[in-house]
Amino acid sequence: MSEELKFLGFKKDIVVLDDIIPQEMADSVEEKVIADIFPWYLLRDIEKSKLTEKDNFRVVNDENTVNTLQLGHGIYNMEDVGQEINSNMYAQVHAICDYCCQKFDIKPSYIRQKFNLLGQNSSIKEGKYNTPHIDNRWFNSYSMIYYVNDSDGDTIIFNEMGGKDITKRPDKLTIKKRITPKKNRAILFRGDYFHTSTNPTKSEKRIVLNVNLTDINE
């Protein structure tokens, strides 16, 4: 992917669609990722080192931030390592992503695909959230989140944006939209919005498929 390609501008801002893939496909992916043999890896929502990097303007660490542990499972990543497939779930995940993109009227070029699992965290009180961030260095990209299971733990999208010319982190974040997880719901939003997750406080787990992509038509 070349950053020199002319970007024609975002056609979409924030879009939420329910029942986005066939039910049997939604049931199948949930069944596989909650199986005892599915490989999960312990991570943080954002690496702690990135919070203190003075020239990293893609993360925010404010008074409401809770840097939480999570489990992750990488599927595909071309941002840091070139095109690399990391999982035998690739074919199924790619099919899900293509199906979602068709519904969103996107012709995708994928940057990253991964599963994230958040468990309960007692530090998530009213007004608290996980680390606000922008997913990748391509500010002309979209973020797409597919909710694998029913749970609480909203996704929060902020009004504040990043960009290639940003020289500081936002002084204050204001909430633009909250989206509650629901199985077989997906959201698509501009990749230059700061956004974050919240841990569930009622449900046992919150599982999402997190995807970064560009629209070839833009």
Residue ranges of model-derived segments:
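Catalytic core of non-heme Fe(II) oxygenases with the double-stranded beta-helix
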Residues: 86-218
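Ampiphathic alpha-helical segments that act as solvent-exposed interaction surfaces
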Residues: 1-2, 204
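Non-heme Fe(II)/2-oxoglutarate
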Residues: 2-106
